[in-house]
Amino acid sequence: MTITNINQLDPINGLYTYAEYLLWKFEERVELLKGKLFKMSAPSPAHQVVQSNLNIELGLYIRNQKCQIYPAPFDVRLPAKGEIGDAIHTVVQPDLCVVCDRTKIDSRGCIGAPDLVIEIISPGNSKKELKQKFKLYEEAGVREYWVIHPSEEYVIVNVLENNHYKTLSPIVDDEVHSVIFPTLKVHTKEIFRN
């Protein structure tokens, strides 16, 4: 059944799959975290500036790699063990993601872990959502996960080591160095340039 209004869904008790997600025809952007519905808040102007700056900086670097950068909205399906196709319960839309394995890309987005995920914090992001995404990306095998805080102008880099994230010290007014792309360096001044 096609859903045309988000109020037709049960955000508290509902457990949804990608097959159901594909039938939703309402304006609000949402994500599914292990089947649970999370409404995405509209990005702030600072969020949009950071996303645009990163798209430029990373785009210049990535175009010389065998990878591709994808900005939101772009569905990333993260199947849990045993989940396949439209039965997947986790669909996220990272602000930016980099995928080097082109076989993960299909006509609907990415299936499986991107190599790099970047989330830009907006006032509407809940701590619960951030904690769940950290765990989801870790479990899915996202090799590097950046969390960017525009209001305080710092970046946190999480690197997957032995299936667990190692969180590096917050980066303020300095270069952000990627571990998985050793020659990628972006200064926070370029990230937060307005």
Predicted regions mapped to residue ranges:
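Gly/Pro/Ser/Thr-rich low-complexity, intrinsically disordered segments predominantly at protein N-termini
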Residues: 1-194
